[in-house]
C-alpha cells in the first residue's frame, strides 16, 4: 500500500512538473522525427480531377492500348477520359432495369446494393469486356473501345462477376481470348470459384463446396505468366487446427488444362496453392496474415504484396516482395496432405516436382495434362511456404492499414530505386523508397493528403502509368491524376536535396530543381537519396476565431464609460519549435461611450474689408473627441465674430463710367474692327482698360467681275481657200473684294472669225469648231504633239505561270511646240503573257505506319503506303518513280481450330436437300479465324435398302423377290449378336467402376438433394466435408455445376447476343432465400 502511494505521488509530481515547465515538454516535442506531409492545399495545384453527376464508386480503372485514354468504371456508368487532363470523351449510362431492381428488393437487398457496380473492366485489342453486378444479377458486355455505346455481345456475368458489390473478385483476359475469373458464383456468395470461360478451351472451375480447394476466399489479383495463370487471395486456413485464422495464398493453374476424364470432369486438374509468408522476424514472429493488394513487375519477376493484420487485431501493415522463382520453388516441393479429418497434415512427396503443364500425347488420356487425376484430387496444398526476398518486410507501419499498392522503378543519379505508392484506408498515399540492393532500409518520403482537413474516406483503386509517370486514384466521387515528378515544388537547393526524392535533383546550371530528363548534364545534377527526409516541425502561430462581444468598462479622465470587447488567442496553431508569433491585435474594443470635447479655437480670419468697418470670425468643433455611443455633447458656441478696421477711413471712390456705343466698323465686309470707350471718374487710376475692341462685318464680300472691251480685229497668219482668219482679245477678272478699284485684269480671251477673200460673205464665226476656237487662243505658231507608232512587245518576264511584257510609244510625231497641247494617253502599255502554269514534278510523301497484321495466325500480312502528293505531279510534270505500297508477312504460326465439329446431317427435306451446321467457338474471332460458312447442304442420299413408294409401284417381280430375301433367320441372328455384345459392354463398365471404387474422399462433388444417412455414432467426429465424400456421392455427382450454356465445355458464341437471367440447379434452390 505504501509503495502504491509513492508511485501515485511520483506521477502526480511529474504531472505538476510538466504543467510548471511547458518549455521542457515542447523541447521534447520538437526533437521528434516525422515524415513530410503534403496537405491537400499544397498538392491541389498539381492535381487533375474528374467528377460526374450521380456517378460514384470509381473503382475500376484501365488504359487503352495506345495509352492515350483512361477507361473508368463507376456505379451505373462507363467513362472514357483524356489522359492529359481527365477531360470527358464519352460517358455511357449502364443502369439496371426496373424489373431486375424489384427482384433484388424482393430478396431483401437495399437500394444502395441493387445497383450496377462495375467489377470487371478488361481491354482486349479494340474491344472492352466489362461486367457489372446488375442488382445481384451479373451481366457482361463486349463493347467497342472507341465507342462504348456499341455493344457487340451480351452474356451472363455468372462466374465472371460477383453478385454483391461487397465481394472481392479478380479477372483477366488472355491473348487467346480466355477469361479467367475468381469470384463467387451464387447469390449468397457461398460458392467461390476460379473459373475459365470464353475462348476455344473448355470451361473449368475449382471443386464446388470443397474447403480444401477454397475456404471462404477473398480474391485479390491474377496474372498471366508463362504457362500458368496465377491467383492471389486470402482465405480461412484449412490446415490450421487451433481456432480460425486467415492465411494468404498464391495459386496457379495451367492454361492448357482441359479438365479430367471420368474424374475431375469440368474441374481443374492442375490447381495448386501455397501459403505466402510476410512476418516480422523474432523469437516469436509477428505475422501479417491478410493479403490486401499486389503489384507485378514483369521485368524483374517481382511481386509486391500488401499484408495487414486481422481485422480484429491491432492495425498494422507491411510490404513484402516475392520472386517468381520462390513461388515456383514452393510449387515444386512436397504437398501438405491430410488422410482424413482425424489425421494430421503431413508432407507428401511431389510426384511431378518439375511440372510445366506437359500433356499426354496418346492413349485414353490424350491431351490431358501429365498430372495424375487421383493426385490432382488429393494434393492441393503445398507444404513449403513462399518466403519473401528479404527476411524483414520491405516496409512496415503500425496503426495503419494499407489497401492498394503501385510500384515505379526510378533511375537515380547513382542507382535504380523502387518507389512504392501505398493507399491507406483513410484517404492518403504514402510514398516509400526501397533500394534494390537492400543495403539500406526503406524510407517514407512523403504522405499525400487527397482530401481537405477533417475529411477521410478509403481509396477505391490505384493505377500507375509508367510511360507518363502519373498515378491515377479512384475515389468514391471522383478520379484524381497525380504527377509523380513534382520537382518544381521545391524552390531552393536545400529543399530539393533535403527531400531525398529519387525523381528530383538540383541542376547547377539552371539553378532549379529538375528531373534527370530535364537536366542539361548529369555531371551538373546534384542528388542525395542516402537518408530519410524529416518533416519541418517549425509551426508559425496563427490566431483562432474571435470570442463573442462582451460588455467592458473604460475610464475617460474622471468619467467611466461602457464598451464592447472581444479577444482571440494565438492557438490555431500556437507557435512551436521556433515558429513566428501571431501578428496583429489579440483584443478589439468597439462601441465605447465617449463625451464630446471642444477643439481649440482657430485663428481669427482676415478682416472682411480693407478699409472701413468689417468683421473677423473664428471657429471650433465638438470633435476632441466626438461624442459616441451615448456620450455627452459639447456645451457652448462653435463660432465667434468681432469688428475690425473701425478707425481706418476709406479714400474717395474711383469708378468707371459705363461703356459707350460701338464705333463704325473699319470694313463693310470681309471682317473689320470696331471699338468702344469708357471714362474713370474721381481719379485717373481706375483698374482696367478704357478701350475695348471687337471684330465686325465678318460676312464674306460679294464676288466682283471686271471685263475689258474687245480689241479691234487683227488678221492671223492662217489662210484657207483664199480667205483669212482674224482674231480679237479681251480680259476678265473675278474676286471677292470690298473695293471694286482693287480688281486687276487677268485672264485673256481670244475670239476668231473667217473672212472670205472675195468679200461676198464678209467675216463670220459660223462653222468654226470648238476645238479650232480653243486652238485659236494660242499663237498661230503653236504645234500640238502626236504619238509615234507602238514598238514591238518586249520579251515575257516569265516562261510560265503568268508573266508581264510591255511596249512603248513616244510623243514626237510631232512634238508639242510653242504652247501646243501634249499627247494624250499612256506612253507605256503592259500585257500578261505565258499564263499557263509551270509543270510540277511529283514527289513521294512519307511512308505511313505499318498496318495491323491482317490475321493473328495462319499467315497474314501488314502493309504501308505512300502517295505521290508531296507535291502531286501537275501541268505535264514527271510522275513519282517507285512503289506506292509495301507488304510484309506476319503471324505465320498455324491457327488454333476456331470452328466446332460439323453437326450430323439433317433429315431429308421435301426439297431433297440435307443440311448440317457448325459454330464459331471464339468470342473474339480475328483474321482468318471462323472464315467460311456456318451451314452446308447436299442432295439427299437414300439408303440402298430403302425404295420410295413410287418406285415400289413400278418395280418388277424380280426386285420384289430380292427385297423378300431378308427372312426370320436373319432377324434371330442379329438379335443374338446384339445380346452378346451388350453383355460384354456391361461387364467392361462394371470392371472399370470397381477399379475406381477406392478413390480418395477428395473427389469433387456437389451437395446432393437427399444425402444418404450417416452412422450417428461417428457423426460428431466427421466434418461437413466428409459427408459428401462417399463413393455413392461420387458416382451420382462427379461433375461440377457449370453455367448452363457451358455444360458442353464450349462457349456458344451465338448465344452471346442474348441476356440471360441466372439459373440455379435443383440442389441450389434452398439458397435462394438467403
UniProtKB/Swiss-Prot annotation:
TM annotation in the entry: 969-989
Record domain Sema: where: 35-484
Locations listed in the record: Membrane
Matches recorded under Pfam families: PSI, Sema, TSP1_2, TSP_1
Membrane topology: Single-pass type I membrane protein
Molecular functions (GO terms): chemorepellent activity; chondroitin sulfate proteoglycan binding; heparan sulfate proteoglycan binding; semaphorin receptor binding; syndecan binding
Keyword Ribosomal protein annotated: no
Residue ranges the record marks as coiled coil: none
Quaternary structure note: Binds PLXNB3.
PANTHER family xrefs: SEMAPHORIN, SEMAPHORIN-5A
Listed name of the protein: Semaphorin-5A
Amino acid at each position: 500500500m505504501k509503495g502504491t502511494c509513492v508511485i501515485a505521488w511520483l506521477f502526480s509530481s511529474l504531472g505538476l512538473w510538466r504543467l510548471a515547465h511547458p518549455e521542457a515538454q515542447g523541447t521534447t516535442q520538437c526533437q521528434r522525427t516525422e515524415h513530410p506531409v503534403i496537405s491537400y492545399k499544397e498538392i491541389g495545384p498539381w492535381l487533375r480531377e474528374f467528377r460526374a453527376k450521380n456517378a460514384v464508386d470509381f473503382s475500376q480503372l484501365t488504359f487503352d492500348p495506345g495509352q492515350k485514354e483512361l477507361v473508368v468504371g463507376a456505379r451505373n456508368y462507363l467513362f472514357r477520359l483524356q489522359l492529359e487532363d481527365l477531360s470527358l470523351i464519352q460517358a455511357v449510362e449502364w443502369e439496371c432495369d426496373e424489373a431486375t431492381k424489384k427482384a433484388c428488393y424482393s430478396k431483401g437487398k437495399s437500394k444502395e446494393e441493387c445497383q450496377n457496380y462495375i467489377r470487371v473492366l478488361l481491354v482486349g485489342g479494340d474491344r472492352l469486356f466489362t461486367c457489372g453486378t446488375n442488382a445481384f444479377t451479373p451481366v457482361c458486355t463486349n463493347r467497342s473501345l472507341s465507342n462504348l455505346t456499341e455493344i457487340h455481345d451480351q452474356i451472363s456475368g455468372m462466374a465472371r462477376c460477383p453478385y454483391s458489390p461487397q465481394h472481392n473478385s479478380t479477372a483477366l483476359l488472355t491473348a487467346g481470348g480466355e477469361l479467367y475469373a475468381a469470384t463467387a458464383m451464387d447469390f449468397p456468395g457461398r460458392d467461390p470459384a476460379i473459373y475459365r470461360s470464353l475462348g476455344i478451351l473448355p470451361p473449368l472451375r475449382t471443386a464446388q463446396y470443397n474447403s480444401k480447394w477454397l475456404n471462404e476466399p477473398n480474391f485479390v489479383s491474377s496474372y498471366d505468366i508463362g504457362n500458368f495463370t496465377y491467383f492471389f487471395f486470402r482465405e480461412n486456413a484449412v490446415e490450421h487446427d487451433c481456432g480460425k485464422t486467415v492465411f494468404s495464398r498464391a495459386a496457379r493453374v495451367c492454361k492448357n488444362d482441359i479438365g479430367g476424364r471420368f474424374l475431375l470432369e469440368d474441374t481443374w486438374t492442375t490447381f495448386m496453392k501455397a501459403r505466402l509468408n510476410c512476418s516480422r522476424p523474432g523469437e516469436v514472429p509477428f505475422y501479417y496474415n491478410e493479403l490486401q493488394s499486389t503489384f507485378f513487375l514483369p521485368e524483374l519477376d517481382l511481386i509486391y504484396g500488401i499484408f495487414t493484420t486481422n481485422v480484429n487485431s491491432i492495425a498494422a501493415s507491411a510490404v513484402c516482395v516475392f520472386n517468381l522463382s520462390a513461388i515456383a520453388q514452393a510449387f515444386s516441393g512436397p504437398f501438405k496432405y491430410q488422410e482424413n479429418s482425424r489425421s494430421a497434415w503431413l508432407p507428401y512427396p511431389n510426384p511431378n516436382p518439375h511440372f510445366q503443364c506437359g500433356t499426354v500425347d496418346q492413349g485414353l488420356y490424350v491431351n490431358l495434362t501429365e498430372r495424375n487425376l487421383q493426385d490432382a484430387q488429393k494434393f492441393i496444398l503445398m507444404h513449403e511456404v513462399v518466403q519473401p526476398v528479404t527476411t524483414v518486410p520491405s516496409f512496415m507501419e503500425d496503426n495503419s492499414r494499407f489497401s492498394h499498392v503501385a510500384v515505379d522503378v526510378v533511375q537515380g543519379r547513382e542507382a535504380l530505386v523502387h518507389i512504392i505508392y501505398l493507399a491507406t484506408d483513410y484517404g492518403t498515399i504514402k510514398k516509400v523508397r526501397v533500394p534494390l540492393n537492400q543495403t539500406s532500409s526503406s524510407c517514407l518520403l512523403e504522405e499525400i493528403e487527397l482530401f481537405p482537413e477533417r475529411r477521410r474516406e478509403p481509396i477505391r483503386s490505384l493505377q500507375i502509368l509508367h510511360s507518363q509517370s502519373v498515378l491515377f486514384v479512384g475515389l468514391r466521387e471522383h478520379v484524381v491524376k497525380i504527377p509523380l515528378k513534382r520537382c518544381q515544388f521545391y524552390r531552393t537547393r536545400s529543399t530539393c536535396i533535403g527531400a531525398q526524392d529519387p525523381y528530383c535533383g538540383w541542376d547547377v546550371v539552371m539553378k532549379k530543381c529538375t528531373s534527370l530528363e530535364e537536366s542539361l548534364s548529369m555531371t551538373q545534377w546534384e542528388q542525395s537519396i542516402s537518408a530519410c527526409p524529416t518533416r519541418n516541425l517549425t509551426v508559425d502561430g496563427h490566431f483562432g476565431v474571435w470570442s463573442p462581444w462582451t460588455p467592458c468598462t473604460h475610464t475617460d479622465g474622471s468619467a467611466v464609460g461602457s464598451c464592447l470587447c472581444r479577444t482571440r488567442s494565438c492557438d490555431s496553431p500556437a507557435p512551436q519549435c521556433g515558429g513566428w508569433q501571431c501578428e496583429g491585435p489579440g483584443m478589439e474594443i468597439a462601441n465605447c461611450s465617449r463625451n464630446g470635447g471642444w477643439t481649440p479655437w482657430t485663428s481669427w480670419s482676415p478682416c472682411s474689408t480693407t478699409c472701413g468697418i468689417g468683421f473677423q470670425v473664428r471657429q471650433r468643433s465638438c470633435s476632441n473627441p466626438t461624442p459616441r455611443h451615448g456620450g455627452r455633447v459639447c456645451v457652448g458656441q462653435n463660432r465667434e465674430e468681432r469688428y475690425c478696421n473701425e478707425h481706418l477711413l476709406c479714400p474717395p471712390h474711383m469708378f468707371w463710367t459705363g461703356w459707350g456705343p460701338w464705333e463704325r466698323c473699319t470694313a463693310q465686309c470681309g471682317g473689320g474692327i470696331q471699338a468702344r470707350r469708357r471714362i474713370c471718374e474721381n481719379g485717373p487710376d481706375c483698374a482696367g482698360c478704357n478701350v475695348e475692341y471687337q471684330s465686325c462685318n465678318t460676312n464674306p464680300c460679294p464676288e466682283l467681275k471686271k471685263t475689258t472691251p474687245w480689241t479691234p480685229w487683227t488678221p492671223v497668219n492662217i489662210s484657207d481657200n483664199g480667205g483669212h482668219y482674224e482674231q480679237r482679245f479681251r480680259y476678265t477678272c473675278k474676286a471677292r473684294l470690298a473695293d471694286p478699284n482693287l480688281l486687276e485684269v487677268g485672264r485673256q480671251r481670244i475670239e476668231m472669225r473667217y473672212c472670205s477673200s472675195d468679200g461676198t460673205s464678209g467675216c463670220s464665226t459660223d462653222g468654226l469648231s470648238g476645238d479650232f476656237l480653243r486652238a485659236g487662243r494660242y499663237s498661230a505658231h503653236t504645234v500640238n504633239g502626236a504619238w509615234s507608232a507602238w514598238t514591238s512587245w518586249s520579251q515575257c518576264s516569265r516562261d510560265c505561270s503568268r508573266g508581264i511584257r510591255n511596249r512603248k510609244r513616244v510623243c514626237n510625231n510631232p512634238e508639242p511646240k510653242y504652247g501646243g497641247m501634249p499627247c494624250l494617253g499612256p506612253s507605256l502599255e503592259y500585257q500578261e503573257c505565258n499564263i499557263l502554269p509551270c509543270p510540277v514534278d511529283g514527289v513521294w510523301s512519307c511512308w505511313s505506319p505499318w498496318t495491323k497484321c491482317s490475321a493473328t495466325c495462319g499467315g497474314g500480312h501488314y502493309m504501308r503506303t505512300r502517295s505521290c502528293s508531296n507535291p502531286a505531279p501537275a501541268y505535264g510534270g514527271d510522275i513519282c518513280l517507285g512503289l506506292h505500297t509495301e507488304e510484309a508477312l506476319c503471324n505465320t504460326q498455324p491457327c488454333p481450330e476456331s470452328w466446332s465439329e460439323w453437326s450430323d446431317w439433317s433429315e431429308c427435306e421435301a426439297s431433297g436437300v440435307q443440311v448440317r451446321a457448325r459454330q464459331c467457338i471464339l468470342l473474339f474471332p480475328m483474321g482468318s479465324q471462323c472464315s467460311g460458312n456456318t451451314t452446308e447442304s447436299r442432295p439427299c442420299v437414300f439408303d440402298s435398302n430403302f425404295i420410295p413408294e413410287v418406285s415400289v409401284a413400278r418395280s418388277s417381280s424380280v426386285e420384289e423377290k430380292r427385297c423378300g430375301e431378308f427372312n426370320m433367320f436373319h432377324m434371330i441372328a442379329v438379335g443374338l449378336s446384339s445380346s452378346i455384345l451388350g453383355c460384354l459392354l456391361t461387364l467392361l463398365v462394371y470392371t472399370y467402376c470397381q477399379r475406381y471404387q477406392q478413390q480418395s474422399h477428395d473427389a469433387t462433388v456437389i451437395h446432393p438433394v437427399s444425402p444418404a444417412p450417416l452412422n450417428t455414432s461417428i457423426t460428431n467426429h466427421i466434418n461437413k466435408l466428409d459427408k459428401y465424400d462417399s463413393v455413392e456421392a461420387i458416382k451420382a455427382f462427379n461433375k461440377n455445376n457449370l453455367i448452363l450454356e457451358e455444360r458442353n465445355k464450349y462457349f456458344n458464341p451465338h448465344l452471346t447476343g442474348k441476356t440471360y437471367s441466372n439459373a440455379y440447379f435443383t440442389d441450389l434452390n434452398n439458397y435462394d432465400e438467403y
